[in-house]
Design a protein with these regions (language model features):
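Substrate-recognition/specificity elements adjacent to catalytic centers across diverse enzyme folds
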Residues: 2-197, 205-207
């Protein structure tokens, strides 16, 4: 594997600050730091895209494997991978995968299922599979299955299916009201605290 020039610092709160020589180096560092902090969730996603959920979670996991096959995720990614992704994006994903694979190699005792090494196409398949769920495909499919656990995507509130209009929340703070004299726009992104759709805080720096 290609060597990477990257340094990872942790601040007082444990947030990683990643300094890479190139963009792929920084992506490598981001993946390694993320693996240090939440390797369990990262593995859950990898198990999903490798269509091994049935082996790991039994019946409910097998439903996710079926959906991956039914939606032809692998075929779609295989068909468009080279034509729809730029060389720069592929290099970023290669660096990211190397970071995960290195952490997995160094921490064999934490591996749940033998799904390594991770490859760039695995990352793409994860996005291709999960993105339609954010637009409501999971709600359309939910009635087809009697699951104790929804397929890797956190089920949304039943209220979201209500015909009654439901708004989000956000507010602005004027310079006169803010402590630093700056205008602020505060929103709630509706992200869960944990799981595959939770956010991860990191500061990434590249010399490119």
């Amino acid at each position: 594997a290609k060597s990477r020039e990257v340094t990872i610092y942790r601040d007082t709160w444990g947030v990683p600050h990643i300094f890479g020589k190139t963009d792929p180096d920084a992506a490598f560092g981001l993946a390694y730091a993320h693996s240090e902090d939440d390797f369990s969730t990262i593995q859950d996603v990898i198990i999903m895209v490798k269509q091994k959920s049935g082996l790991f979670k039994g019946k409910d996991g097998a439903v996710t494997d079926f959906l991956m096959e039914w939606l032809r995720i692998y075929e779609s990614v295989d068909k468009f991978y080279h034509s729809h992704l730029s060389p720069d994006v592929k290099l970023l994903m290669e660096g990211y995968c190397q970071g995960i694979n290195l952490f997995a190699h160094e921490n064999n005792d934490e591996i749940k299922l033998n799904v390594f090494p991770v490859e760039p196409r695995d990352i793409v398949m994860g996005f291709v599979f999960r993105t339609p769920m954010f637009f409501g495909l999971d709600r359309e499919l939910e009635s087809l299955f009697n699951l104790t656990e929804k397929p890797e995507i956190q089920s949304k509130s039943k209220k979201e299916n209500s015909p009654t209009p439901i708004g989000s929340n956000g507010f602005a703070v004027s310079p006169k009201r803010s402590e630093n004299g700056e205008t602020m726009l505060v929103i709630n992104s509706h992200q869960p605290w944990d799981g595959p759709t939770s956010w991860y805080e990191a500061h990434v720096h590249s010399e490119e």
